[in-house]
């Protein structure tokens, strides 16, 4: 049991009891086994997982240096954070304010004039337009396939098909124009706001 633990972690962790300086123990790995068997892993991890393991290994375990430089051998080193605690509290407060604004509906995307309801309306129009465009495309393909299979054009006369296609195309263009106008209003509101602020 003890041998398996040593094989799994050949590098001594700082949390383990410290050894005398200059005495690093190496666990012999049989040459007949692959690296994954020597580590007790069932298979080699993917490249992403390997990078994750490397990072986790660097953070958790560090070999004890021969010189013993930088602290006593018996006490573990503490991780030093690059971010100040006050900065973390400030970011936390900002995120909480953002969350409160989101839940209250005060969150603005393109300025004070544009709300998420307007953006939601634009998104719904885009989806409606995409569905209409897709259904027109599918209907046209199905009609072409039916005509090829039958060899004879049954169903609607050619003139009716043309008027129906024109009507659908007009509806598609009308929806596209509405969508374009809505997006244009959002952009105009966004561009107008920076001009208003310096004057105030």
From Swiss-Prot:
Tissue specificity comment: Expressed in the retina, pericardium and limb epithelium.
GO biological process: cilium assembly
Cellular compartments annotated: Cytoplasm, Cytoskeleton, Microtubule organizing center, Centrosome
Compositionally biased region (Acidic residues): 140-152
Entry GO terms, CC: centrosome; cytoplasm
Annotated region (Disordered), positions in chain: 1-49, 140-165
Main localisation: cytoplasm
InterPro entries, A to Z: CCDC28
Ranges of Basic residues composition bias in the record: 1-10
In-chain residues carrying the UniProt-annotated modification Phosphoserine: 46, 115
Coiled coil region boundaries: 158-189
Modified residues (N-acetylmethionine): 1
Keyword flag Cytoplasm: yes
Keywords: Acetylation, Cilium biogenesis/degradation, Coiled coil, Cytoplasm, Cytoskeleton, Phosphoprotein
Pfam name, any one: CCDC28
Chain's role: Involved in ciliogenesis. Regulates cilia length through its interaction with MAPKAP1/SIN1 but independently of mTORC2 complex. Modulates mTORC2 complex assembly and function, possibly enhances AKT1 phosphorylation. Does not seem to modulate assembly and function of mTORC1 complex.
Subunit structure: Interacts with BBS1, BBS2, BBS4, BBS5, BBS6, BBS7 and TTC8/BBS8. Interacts with MAPKAP1/SIN1 isoform 1 and RICTOR.
Record protein name field: Coiled-coil domain-containing protein 28B
